[in-house]
Amino acid sequence: MTGDTKHLPLEDIHVAAGARFGAFAGWSMPLTYPAGVMKEHLHAREHAGLFDISHMKLFKVSGPQAAALLNRACPLDAGALETAQSKLTFFLNEEAGIMDDLIVTRLGDTSFMVVANAGNAVADEKHLRTLASAFDVVVEPLERVFLAIQGPEAWAVLGRAGIETGSLLFMHGIEPRKDWFMSRSGYTGEDGFEIGLPEADARALVAKL
């Protein structure tokens, strides 16, 4: 894979683990490891699994009209969200067609985190910035490693790594440390957490896990 293919910040860790890579949404992504897909699947279902989802995009939306912007962009009453509450929603076009599904989390009175999919990240940012021009807001794309720790033992695994998760409810998200975003969410059907954090912190966390 050459040309404009994007690479994960932690690609070297995947290479060292024996990953086989394939193309997905313009990214070179680890698809399989020597243990095999079935063992990985069962381990995540029965214990916990670590997934690198850094191809997904985080946007921080802040300012006096942050909620109003998200109300305009999504079928969502952003102002009704409680602090730390997350909501699955969509970006809609002018014909009310779905552009992308995403999760919006309220971080504070005037700030929100938006997690969008890799395949639509560029279009999502363009759409959000176009709408934002009519509002008193700042749209900030974040350069973060994004990790998902999923499975019934995810909370215990993170606890052993020094990350407290017990007070974080499902479909809620917080900023537990400087430049970190952590939510209790995922797409595996099990309990789990998603953490966006700087590369240096991510490498330290992966080493502990």
Locate the predicted segments by residue:
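Basic, glycine/lysine-rich polyanion-binding surfaces/domains
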Residues: M1-L209
